[in-house]
Amino acid sequence: MDAIDWLAEMSRRLEKRIPDREARFEFLRSVHYEATRAGLDPQLVRGLIQVESGFKKYAVSTAGARGFMQVMPFWIKVVGLSDDNLFHLRTNLRYGCTILRHYLDIERGDLFRALGRYNGSLGQAEYPNIVRMAWQNQWSYSKSKLALR
C-alpha cells in the first residue's frame, strides 16, 4: 500500500507540470527505477530535475545540455553509445543519475560538492542549495506528512 500512496501523492504534485496522467506515471516509475539503480534518492532526483529543466523533456540550455536532467552531449562519448538520444526519458534519466552517482563517488558522498560538480559550479553554494530546497520542500515524502494534510 505504501507504493500506491507514494505514487498517488507524487502524481498529484506533478500534475500541473506533466498534465498527461500516463506520461506522469511513466515519468515517476522511470525516475524511481533509474535513481534506485544508481543508489540515489528518487526524491532528490526529482528536485534536481525541477531545478535543471522544470520538468521539460525537450529543454536545452544555452550550453547545450539536454532533457529533464540537462545532460551535456559529451557524456555520450564518455559513457554511452553514439546514437543515444538525450531527449528519450529513460536514456536521459540513466545518464543524469549515473553522472550524479559518479560525482557522489568522487566526492565520497558529499552531496553539496557532487551537486556543484553536476552543475559545473563546484565551490559555489547557490545551485546545491536550490536543489536541496526543491528536494526537501517539494519532493520529500513521509506518511506522517500526508496525515497532516
Task: Report the location of each language-model feature.
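Catalytic glycan-binding domains that act on GlcNAc-containing polysaccharides
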Residues: 1-149
